[in-house]
A protein has these predicted regions:
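Acidic-basic catalytic patches of nuclease active cores, encompassing PD-(D/E)XK
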Residues: 1-65, 73-78
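Short, charge-rich binding segments
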Residues: 60, 84-89, 132-134
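Generic alpha-helical scaffold signal
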Residues: 63-64, 90, 115-118
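Conserved catalytic cores of phosphodiester-cleaving nucleases, focusing on short active-site segments
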Residues: 69-71, 92-103, 124
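Active-site beta-strand-loop-beta-strand hairpin of nuclease catalytic cores
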Residues: 72-95
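Catalytic cores of nucleic-acid endonucleases
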Residues: 101-152
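Domain-level recognition of nuclease-like catalytic cores that cleave nucleotide substrates
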Residues: 133-179
Length: 179
């Protein structure tokens, strides 16, 4: 996946930190979240919404699956309205799940199923839509893998047909260009 996976969108600090989906103690440091999930990141001063903490705070039994993080991205585009030029700001939530524990292509089969992807994405997107009607969700769930062995993992991901229109494997270094 080239580094243009985000289509010109960039992390929106203000919108993320003001998101109505946040509940107590769910706005967390991105690098700390990556570390908790078994990875390492040099990204600093970036806060994301911990979807696992939100899910756990709801007290739903059985506990549903969720994506690991959500955050808001935005991009501005210039357009002409008659003789006037205007700027349009577009925003959306990104949902990502860290898969740093998948260290070899064979583990793609053991650690990720289509049902897992669907369950994580469906719960997370329905929660966000229920709390924030002003900013839409991206319709793609991003699964973030370590840069090591990424090509082999991505090939297995594609052959397993996990790279559906609703999910996409992205290597960590490409994912982090959004910040």
């Amino acid at each position: 996946m080239p580094s243009d996976w985000a289509d010109g969108y960039k992390y929106d600090k203000n919108e993320t930190e003001a998101s109505p989906i946040i509940v107590k103690n769910t706005l967390v440091d991105y690098a700390a979240m990556v570390k908790r999930e078994g990875g390492k990141s040099k990204v600093s001063n970036v806060l994301v919404i911990d979807m696992d903490a939100i899910k756990n705070s709801l007290g739903i039994v059985p506990t549903p699956q969720s994506m690991d993080v959500a955050f808001v991205v935005s991009k501005s585009s210039e357009y002409e309205n008659g003789s006037n030029k205007s700027i349009k700001l577009t925003k959306k939530y990104i949902l990502a799940d860290f898969k740093f524990n998948v260290t070899s292509p064979d583990k793609v089969y053991k650690n990720i199923s289509n049902d897992d992807i669907k369950g994580k994405f469906d719960f997370s997107i329905s929660y966000i839509r229920g709390k924030d009607i002003n900013i839409p969700c991206c319709n793609i769930a991003y699964f973030i893998f370590n840069d090591t062995n990424y090509q082999q993992i991505r090939n297995r991901w594609s052959r397993r047909n996990l790279n559906s229109p609703k999910s996409r494997a992205v290597k960590q270094s490409d994912f982090e260009v959004i910040f």
